[in-house]
Amino acid sequence: MKALIYARVSTNKEQQETSLKRQEEELTAIAAENGMEVVKVISEKASGYEMDRDGVFELLDEIKNADIDVILVQDETRLGRGNAKIALLHCIYREGVKVYTTAHRGELELSEADSMVLEIVSIVEEYQRKIHNMKIRRGMKRAVKNGFKPQKNLKNQHGNSGKEKIEVPISEIVRLRANKLTFAEIAATLRGFGYDVSKATVHRRFQEYIENEETAE
C-alpha cells in the first residue's frame, strides 16, 4: 500500500517542532510495520479548527490525483478538530482512502458519534447529487418546451478549436435567459447536451454579450 504521512502542530514553539519530527518518525515506523510505502510526507503548523491550510489542500490533491491508499496520522485530531475534522474525514473516505493512526496502531476507529455524523453527511451528499441531476433534467425539458432544439441549435458546435476560452452557444444562452431560465438552469441544460460549462461561465458569457451589445449601440 502507498501511504501519505500527515503531521501537524498548532504553534511555532520550539517544542512543537520536536513534536512534528516525533510524529513523522512514529508514522514512518507504523508504515514499515504494515509494509507500506511512504510516498509523501506533509508537515505543517496550523490550528486544527481551520480548513484553510496548505497541508490540507496538498493532502486532498494527493489523494485525488495520486495513487494513495492510506493516510497516516498520530491521531484523528491531527487532521483537524470539530467540524474541520469531520469534513476532512468525509473527503478522505469518499476517495476510498483509509486512515491509520499511531494511537490505534492501525486503522482509525471512529467514535459512534463521528460515524453517525459521517453517515448523515454521505446521505445528504447523495441526495444533493440526485437533486442536481433532477435540475439538469428539468432544465432540459423546460428549454425544449420553450423552443430549444439541440439537434439544430447545437449542431457542429462541439469542435475543439484549441482555444483556452470555453466555447459555448451564446445565442442559446441569450434565448434561454429570455425564456426566464436562471443561469444555473442554463448551465445544467447545456451540460446535459454535452457542454462542460459552469453557472459562472454562463453568467460571464451573458454579461460579455450584454456589454458588447451596449458598446455597439
Curated annotation (Swiss-Prot):
Cited CDD domains: Ser_Recombinase
Induction: Repressed by LexA.
Alphabetical list of InterPro entries matching this protein: Resolv_N, Resolvase-like_N_sf, SSR_resolvase
A Pfam family annotated for this UniProt entry: Resolvase
SUPFAM superfamilies: Resolvase-like
Domain Resolvase/invertase-type recombinase catalytic per the UniProt entry, residue ranges: 2-147
GO biological process, one term: DNA recombination
Stated family: Belongs to the site-specific recombinase resolvase family.
Name used for this protein in its record: Resolvase homolog YneB
Record organism: Bacillus subtilis (strain 168)
Gene behind the chain: yneB
